[in-house]
Amino acid sequence: MRIVPLQPSITLTLAALTRLDTLSACTKYCLEALPELATRNLQIVHDSWTADTEEIRRTQPDLVIASVPYRIESLAAILQSGLPILTLAPHTLADIYKDIRLIAAIVSAQPEAESLITQMQSTIKSTRHRSAQRSQTPVVYCEEWGNPLIHSQSWVAELVEAAGGQYLGTPGAQTTPEAIAAANPDVLLFSWCGAGNRVPLERVITQRNWHHLKAVQNRHVYCIPDQHLNTPTHTLLEGLACIAAATHPNLHPPHPELIQLQKSKLNEVVEQSDPDPSPASASSAK
């Protein structure tokens, strides 16, 4: 079996299943997510946002696997070319478990999949149990895109609930700075697709005039590396740990990759152009 994964979530899943030997190529974002791939000398192909059919064909795959986010036109071109393609579109944690099992069935790694899923479920259950000791349930705004503002996906809402928070808004829906300001959430979490850990928190707060929000006043504003929340596979457990640390720091240990707002920098921010990533960078979301 020769597989071309078009998103890091697929590659990371194959790695967890110990089936990286099935890869015939990968994207640059897969390589960033799993640097050890560099030793395999795999051909680098474009991802599911900008996929190149002929480029993929040259790797002679038995199967191309794509996942969210993707551009319909790119996947349609692959399908029309006759290349075998499997497209995954998970929304919930249950969907992610199903996708892991599906990938495992393709590469004959069912026992590894069940072990991985059990680990995910156990960690989520443990986090939920610890969060049950909370004295309050803070309202949490999670943002996966900054222009326009877009709420994080449904699986993130589930992670927020497991961490002891109340998810604000409709998962995956657009919103506005005014709507979020009116809701005045207790915690602000930013995890922009394709931005890694580079969301400019102080600039965002200043440009949206959110200084008065209680989350800002209390410094409950954080950036979570996007691969921890936007990659639908087992690595979401890191995102859960970040959310838990941000939502209930008295109950959960700090996370080394959780970046907190520095209020001292707010007054230093000079109004600039929109800092949000370009649409092209969305393809690195997993």
PLM regions: where:
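N-terminal ligand-binding lobe of clamshell/alpha-beta domains
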Residues: 1-286
